[in-house]
UniProtKB/Swiss-Prot annotation:
Family: Belongs to the RacA family.
Keyword Membrane: no
Annotated localization: Cytoplasm
Gene name of the record: racA
Protein name, UniProt field: Chromosome-anchoring protein RacA
A UniProt-annotated Pfam family: MerR_1
Length: 174
């Protein structure tokens, strides 16, 4: 069995942070074994690849420009997905746009239905208030009529002050 190192040990050998090693492994797709705790295990070949990456980065290259030539079998190439035909893409886009337009139309119709329902409900409330107002006006008119009748029949009870009768003679008394 070959010698295996954990991420921390490899990072110490390279003089970098352990998260840097993990980032390189992920970015470049380096295939490593993992132990039962999920820790990455590196072999001598992995270490040479990581040193090559480190040297290229130290020389000023960006990570996307780094080329790994040695031990390429350790690098997992990203799978390229097949291209979709332009016609198929446009057809699918058109279907999506039609579906979106249909959903917008349904949403608009639903909103119109809700507004119509609310208007009908408000109209019913206004009609009910109008009927209540009319009945109150009738009751007020009846109460006013009764009050006028009582004032005619019983002027003193209604609060009228009786008129004083002055005799003609009293006017000249000193």
């Amino acid at each position: 069995m070959a010698v295996q190192w954990k991420t921390k040990e490899v990072s110490e050998q390279l003089g970098v942070n352990p998260t840097t090693v993990q980032r390189w492994v992920k970015f470049f797709g380096i295939q490593c074994e993992t132990n039962e705790h999920g820790h990455l295990l590196f072999e001598k070949e992995h270490l040479t690849v990581l040193k090559a990456i480190q040297n290229q980065l130290k020389s000023g290259k960006k990570m996307r420009d780094v080329v790994i030539e040695e031990n390429e079998q350790l690098i997992q190439k990203p799978e390229t997905q097949p291209m979709v035909a332009t016609e198929q893409y446009e057809q699918r886009t058109k279907q999506f746009m039609e579906k979106i337009a249909e959903l917008e139309k349904q949403l608009s119709q639903k909103a119109d239905d809700v507004v119509s329902y609310q208007i009908l409900k408000h109209r019913a409330e206004i009609d009910e208030m109008f009927k209540t107002l009319q009945s109150l006006e009738l009751r007020m008119a009846k109460v006013e009529e009764q009050l006028e009748k009582q004032q005619e029949e019983f002027p003193l009870a209604a609060g009228d002050v009786p008129k004083r009768k002055r005799s003609f003679m009293r006017l000249f008394s000193f």
